[in-house]
Structures are given as C-alpha cells and as structure tokens.
Amino acid sequence: MWRTEDGGTSWSAVRGSPGGDDYQRIWIHPTDPNLILAVSDQGAVVSSNRGESWSNWYTQPTAAVYHVTTDNAFPYRVCSGQQDSGSICVASRSDDGEITFHDWHPANIQEYGIAAPDPRDPEVVFGSARRGVSRYDRRTGQTAQVGPDSAARGEKFGRNVRTMPLIWSPVNPNVLYYTSNVVWKSVDRAHTWTRISPDLARQTWTVPASAGRYASSVTPAPRGAITALSPSPKSGAVLWAGTDDGNIQVTTDGGATWKNVTPAAIKPWTRIFNIEAGHFDARTAYAAANTLRIDDMHPHFWRTHDDGRTWTEINHGIADNAVANSIREDPRVPGLLYAATDAQVWVSLDDGANWQSLRLNMPAISVRDIQVKDDSTCVCADLVAGTHGRGFWILDGLTPIRQLARSRGRAGTYVVTPQTAVRVRFGTNEPTPWPPELPAAQNPAAGAIIDYALAANAAGSVKLEIVDASGRLIRSYSSDDPVLDPDPALDPASYDRVCQKNPGAADCGLPLYWPAPQQRLATHAGLHRFRWDTRYQPIGDNPRTGEVEATGAVPHRSERTPVTPWAAPGRYTVRLTVEGKSYTQPLTLRLDPRVKTPPAGLRQLAALSREMYDLAAASHAAYLQARARVDSLSGAARAQVESLAPAAPARAPRALARPGQPAPATPPTLESASRAALAAAMAMQDADVAPTAAQVAACTRARAQVNAVLARWRRLEPPPRRSRRR
C-alpha cells in the first residue's frame, strides 16, 4: 500500500509484506483523513492515524482456501493452502475449550496448494505446488522439495496450473499421486516418481461463445492440466482424472491404459473441480464440473455407475446461479452424497436424484471443497468444508443424516444409533481463560451425542437414560428437569434483572457471557440432539449442581463444575421413553486415544472411582432415609439419628463435593462421609492415569468413614414394618 501527500509526485510504501498483501480496496473518510479502511486478500484493517498503525485482520474468519484435507492425528487437523496468508493446519478440537492460535500452524504449502498429510505420520504434511511437491515435518520445522523434476519442463514434467492434485492411495498408504497434465506416482513416499499416464488434456480447443466480441483476438494458450484425481477405495488399479479443459479420463489397470469417458455435454473450458471414486464399487464415480469460465452459472454434477460409459447429470433441487465445486460420497451409506457450490453445501439421500440444503448455520459463501472425515483414527463422522472467504467449517456427527438415508426419510419416533463417544475433557486450561474479544473457533461438544426423533409432540415428559452392560442405570435425564428460567446464556438481559433482585442466584456472580446454554430434552415433534457428559448421575435432588467451571472456561460455552466421576469406557444402552414406550440403541464409550496409561492403572482408576461414587451415593441415600424418619422419633433415639443426619443448611441439597475438597472435620455424619467419598473420587478425575499413593490413601480413609457411619445407621435404623398375618 502506497501513500502520496503531494498529488502523486512522490510515493511512500506504508503497509505490506515482502510477498505482497494483495490490497484490493481503500476507503478514506471524506471529512476525516485519519480514518482509513483497507481490504486485502487477508481481510479488512482500519487505521485511525493516517496509516501509521492498523488494526489486526486476524479478528475476522476470512481465510480463502482452495481445497480441504484432514490428517490422522487425534484430534484430527484440517489443512489447506490459503490465499495470500500462508497455509493452515488447524486442530478440529482443542484441549483449551476453544480453538485458538495455539492450535494451528502453517505447513509450508503454497497458497493454492493441496495438503496431503502422511496417513502413517500426521506430523508430516506433503503439499502440491506449481514447482512440484513439498514435504513439511513439524518435528524439525523443515520443508523439502520432493516432487518430480519440475526443473525439466515440457514433455518430461508437463504443464500445471495453480491447484495441482496431490492424493494418497486409499488402499496403499505408501502410494502418493501428483499431477501436471500427466499423472505421477510414487511408491516410496515421494522419494522417486514414475509417470503413469499420457497427456490427459484435450488435444485441441475452440474459443467459447462466451468470449463474445473478443473471440477473434483470443490466441492459443498451452493445453490444459489435470485438476482432479481420485484413486478408487475399492481397487488400486482404478484412477479417475479430470482436467481444467473439460476432460474426464479413467484407468482400470493402474495407468497402463487410459480411456476418455467425458460426457458429451461437458464443453471445452469446463473445469473438472473434483472427481469422487465410488466407495462401494470400482465402476462408480461422481464429478463436479465448474463452468464459470464459459459464463454458465448453473451447477453441473455428474454420476456414472459403469466405468464412465454413461453419465447422468444430477442437479435436481440444487439452487441455480452457483457453479459446482465439489461432490463426495458418504463412505458408510451407499447413495448418500454431499455437494458444494459457490453458495453452500447440499445433501442427497438418493444418489443425486434429489438434493436438499445442508447449509444450516453456514454463511452464504463459495464452498470450494468438502471431505467426509470418518475413520478409526478420528472416532468421528464429520463433514468438513473449506470455503473461499470464511475459513473451515465442520458439521459434527453425520449419524442422523445417515439414518435418514438408510430409511429413505422414514417418519416415526426413534433414537439414532450414536457414533462411538470419546471420553475427552472439554477444556483443561487453568484460569484465566482467553477473553471473549480474542478470536477463537468453537470446540465440538464433549461427551456422547444422542440424536432422537419424535413423530409428534409428546403428551407427557420425555425421559432419556444411560444403562451399562449389567443393566445398571448410570444417568437419567427428563424433560421435567429444572432449569434456570430465563436462560442466562440465551437471554442475559432478562437474567440480569433476576440477579438485580436476587444477587445470590446461580451465575449472578460473573458476567453472563460465560455460561453455556442449558440442555433440556425436547418434547416437540422433530429431530433433536442431546449430550450425555459421560459422567455418573449427580448425587442429590438437583441435577444443576456445580457452578460455572473456571478451568476450561470458554465465553458463551462454559460448563458447570463436574460433581461426579467419569463413566468407565465400555458398552452402554441409550433408552428413550416417550408416552410409556421405550426406544433403545447401543452406545460405545472409548477412552481418549492419546492416553497411554497401562491397562492395570486404568482398571484401578475405574474401580476406585466407581467404588467411591457408590459409597457416596449409599451414604447420601441413608442420610435421606434418616431425615425422613427423624420427625417420627423422640428422645435419645432422635438425638442419635440427628447426630448422624443433621438438618441440612437452607440451600441444601447442593453439590456434595468439589474436586480437591477436603473431608469435613469430625464427628462424621452420613453427609460428611458422602462428601469425603465423592471428594476422593473427584480428586482422581483430572487425568486418565493410575491413582497416586495419596489418592489411594484418601480412598481408604473415605471407605472407612462411610462404612463406619453406615454401620451406625444400620444399628439405629428401625426395622421395616411387617404386615400381621390374619
């Protein structure tokens, strides 16, 4: 960016990087020249002092990416080059409760390049570029050039354009493909390359009608290059290729021979943005044909089930005036397709015969690429989108869409089979958290995601239960569970008035931009999502125990301090009860894959946590029994019971323990013993590691205390009345 103050006689550079920031527009306030707004490929910046200093464009999610890929780390990273801002590899989940600058790092890919993370080593990221292929290693921070000999242009290397495909074989993790106008293959992780195709672009081309009056001045340019490549997940011998001049070619023998299978309706100058080889048979493929360059703004998606011999255009339901960019097939459900245009994302449940919007809360933006992330490394089922101007977006949990596709949209009340849940901590950062004015992206929800559908409005309450493999109830939710009204997260202004009248009410001691919206089971017709936090049932009458958690606090998403231990990894059953009828589905809970604690230590942790929880629950149940009977007693008997179960303070029942809370002083009571056991359990919940000697000792003390007070209670407890025999 340049500035002149003498009518253009002299100029001074005032802003920009050595590589150029690509400024597009500048606006100067007509009456206050100190105020300047500028926009570039990176975002918008503001100066209030004639350009001496500027605001930060990193306050805006304006990344313009060309493609999107994911790696096999846990949590997985989302990677791409981006327009004039360096490449990106950003975690899809953060241990800090929200995704911040701590969670991303460049991978040294050119701005328009395609990232190809090593499937066997997520610390290594390969990237495509005009000059070839790069290899970035996070451990060393170094980048090597490892592509075919790009110095030898012409016939040997071939032609290329800005976004050259670079993709790993889905059937052989050692095989990597790269393209120019020919396909290159490496079987040794980019150490050596072999050319496996002829020139796959059109041999001739004509001037498109859209050139109009300029047609006579158009001069021949170099022929096209390959812009789409898709190896088959079913056969290592099948590859599909598409070019930026409208060719689609396929090989079924590993590149020995290629066949041009371009649909007749695809015109020259059409850019094949992507091809998706079928996941369920090697003869199927889908293609996104982008016709922007010939002034055709209609979407054009194609499908073949016979090796490309015949093609069907599949656009019904997709809005016009937005060209096709990407199409993907769900790897789990045949016929379930996702598509991206220059405006939004779409979904088809019937192999492209009909489409419906999947935009949801996304802005209207050019979605350049989409990927289905679903494998054993991520323990997920997500749809990842790369946009040209709004960065990355992730749709968490495709299971409801998959169920709709399998059932072809059947109606009724049901529970969607949950995807495997991973026991991760939402946020582990110690206070103070990042303030809300700093840019951050949302973490996915922690816990088990449970989707359910109601065919009609429920006549009564809706109940959701989690049952373990032995049939024991672990957690129970009801649509009648008490919640704060109004919700401080959703209506802070109204709740602030509550706080003015009652400063001691929940959440009134902190700004109301911290709490997360409350969960409540929905009772109206439709598809609903609920989350089990993968913990045991709170002990006490009020499920809203615990204040907003300081550790892991996130603006607008801060959870409450947990008051019960984690449920152990294993198999569970989700049971939904509506109007007396129950619907069940199995649920698997897994440990965080990053945990490497030996099994013996994990078993000890689970056993002690469960034992302490059970002791706390038993002691609290005895306390409730004692308080229920104390009014029927008098004299010494009443005094003895009250010594074990004194009346609770006015605000009880509350949370029985907080992590690290010490056991109360003697004399022990049923409630103090319950708190001691729960405190011993909660002290072990911060990490999936074997309990320390101090933690084991605390469990020993709590066990003895609970057993002692329960024994005293049993001696005092009146025997149950028996009916007299008549």
Language model regions located:
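Beta-propeller blade termini and top-face loops
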Residues: M1-L438, A445-A448, P482, P486-Q500
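Beta-strand-rich binding/interaction modules
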Residues: S134-R135, I450-D451, A458-S476, R571-R575
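Low-complexity, Pro/Ser/Thr- and charge-rich linker/hinge segments at domain boundaries
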Residues: T399-F426, T584-A618
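Contiguous beta-strand segments within globular domains
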Residues: T428-K463, V467, A525-R531, S609, ...
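Glycine-centered tight-turn motifs at strand-turn-strand junctions
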Residues: L473-P565
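Preference for long, solvent-exposed alpha-helical segments and helix-linker "stalks"
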Residues: P511, R544, D592, R603-A645
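Short acidic/polar inter-strand loop motif in beta-rich domains
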Residues: P538-N542, T577-Q585
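Mature extracytoplasmic or organellar-lumen-exposed domains after removal of signal/transit peptides
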Residues: L587, H620-R726
